[in-house]
Amino acid sequence: MINNVVLVGRLTKDPDLRYTASGSAVATFTLAVNRNFTNQNGDREADFINCVIWRKPAETMANYARKGTLLGVVGRIQTRNYENQQGQRVYVTEVVCENFQLLESRSASEQRGTGGGSFNNNENGYQSQNRSFGNNNASSGFNNNNNSFNPSSSQSQNNNGMPDFDKDSDPFGGSGSSIDISDDDLPF
């Protein structure tokens, strides 16, 4: 049997971190995941998916992820039920996350703002960040414009928004000065 889930979306609010009676950390959160198609008005709708994550990853998520943060999560679907105070049986379907990845830097999150606004708006979804993710169109992603690497050419010609480096340039070379990285920019 296979029960695998991979989601990319934005947090609708800060993760809710709690601890069980035995001391295990558990965080619940909701991801807004854009659909791959638009509705009749041309807007991209979103699905709001309830998720739960346990132990150390839950604490890490609570420390680093905020409302509007772009996340990738890997997990499994779980269905559970309980009886509410009115005696009714309530069924809950959620994604139990085994791992997550922050998909943008903290500075990118802060430049975007607090993530307010409608998640149905295409500008707030992951599609505007990376239009090739989840798109099965052969003209997107790494196959853009059918360009191939030609070592004899001095520059690659592409239209995918990536910088063009010739074979002799060193994109990591610089003035020899040190890099100033804030602790807030590190994911650990």
UniProtKB/Swiss-Prot annotation:
GO biological process annotation, one example: DNA repair
Domain SSB residue range list: 1-104
InterPro entries named in the record: NA-bd_OB-fold (IPR012340), Primosome_PriB/ssb (IPR000424), ssDNA-bd (IPR011344)
Motif Important for interaction with partner proteins per UniProt: ranges: 183-188
Pfam family, one: SSB
Entry-linked SUPFAM superfamilies: Nucleic acid-binding proteins
Feature: compositional bias, Low complexity: 130-163
Function: Plays an important role in DNA replication, recombination and repair. Binds to ssDNA and to an array of partner proteins to recruit them to their sites of action during DNA metabolism.
Subunit details: Homotetramer.
Protein name: Single-stranded DNA-binding protein
